[in-house]
């Protein structure tokens, strides 16, 4: 019989096994081709070129995506080869050489790859338009997205999947040449671990795994404390090592120990539900520990990165407001022309004028006593003051007397990393003038432009009018003296006002610093700053969400494939149980528990990993934690639930067919 006939007969016979592997290939090609096609879409490129890191971001995401695809396909191929191990053993028994078997399977793989690449590229071509529309929606760009076929994306994908095919063929050849004939017949049915009595050492190691995870979580909450900031990199390595190592020990020892304890408490009186749930988990935990650890860590990392990116995107409005606390900001009396144009166009607005006066102070003096050894405590900088009467225009209830001050405009990551305390005295100076402020309250309300506060988030002192008048004797030492905040009464006027703001050059400010040098600054409008934030963060949130989806689909599919493989291995056991009288619903109760563990435990631990990772440094990315975190987590829970339902459905099919 010729090789071609053998290939056709083999593929026809193994059709029920191939669809799983074939789906993995098609899914991988679709993901990769749609993403590289997206990079070469002219409408998309025109929208993202405003971001200086667009090219680097797309390239980095492409490499990560290729790693995901490589990992996914190699794992699927490994499961596929394991399920065909008996067939490969039979080929050797009838006299076929290992070289001939390798050629036979190589031809099958090549045919599968060619078919998967063609179908995957077609699916990727059509799905790329959907992804392009999503990206433009995230960027708030209006553009007509056309179906664009990129020859560059085609060539890149063909090269990548040719390399992947070569790697798969090497993996397959290695497995055939390095596995004994006897092991081929037992590979699909051998128990992973014989359950023995647990030793005290195993119990200690299992408990140690839990302690390591808890310590990693605790250390993550202290990661950005001032006391540990100097050893940030070392602390991050320790946290990674303890959480990943602890996760492995939990899966390798803790889970099996807990299951064995439950079994022993029943004193041998195990129900069919216990047999089908507890026993398989215990037997397979040795080999599953590595894969479950990897899946858990990948879930935590992908969810954490996706959540942090979403926090940054979600907080783009708050971030813009911290730098531009009003629809428009006019500095140093240089926006009169803009106000005239607003009145000419009958655009109604509210106006608040703030007088500004700089002082020199070391705000670190407001830190807690345990932090006063930190070098930041003695660093002096320019901080601006505003009179109470101006502040009361936006906060009418504010009250001060004597040397009392309110510290406001202080929030975001600055307030999280360097928390300040009220009821402290602070010595400030302005030229030869020196005053002692008593801070009675700290507000996070933004009132002054980020240009004045050196980037936004910097503090502002609200002082009594008498104190402010005294400080203005040193006005010549500081560049900023006046700010006008404009808030439009109708959002419908924003687009027109934006054009007038640009036409009047109201955002171009010239100021003279304390050294007599003239500098030019560009003050954005709130809407302009918000759109800049979205343009710079939109691509990041899209690529991280895309990669997060790829990671999630990969880990979920691997769990699903693994459960399908285990279901086939346990088919004979279900046949015996059905023949001795157990109903389908009795068997399915144990399977429900088993699937709840296989999908639920990695998901729960992964969610905990991502929660503590995000909680440790979310304030560096935005101002809102709860909503983005819950939205991202719910998406992950929903998709994992779908995979669990599919897995249960497959088990139900196997149980029904077992008789």
What is the predicted role of each segment?
Residues 1, 5, 178-195, 568-569, ...:
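Short cytosolic juxtamembrane segments of multi-pass membrane proteins
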Residues 1-29, 194-197, 250-296:
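N-terminal Sec/SRP start-transfer signal
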Residues 16-43, 53-89, 109-123, 157, ...:
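Hydrophobic alpha-helical transmembrane segments of multi-pass inner-membrane transport and secretion
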Residues 37-47, 51, 116, 121-153, ...:
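Short helix-loop junctions at transmembrane helix boundaries
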Residues 49, 55, 316-329, 477-478:
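Membrane-proximal juxtamembrane linkers immediately C-terminal to transmembrane helices
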Residues 112-260:
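Hydrophobic alpha-helical segments
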Residues 326-331, 337-553:
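Basic-flanked hydrophobic alpha-helices used for secretion and membrane insertion
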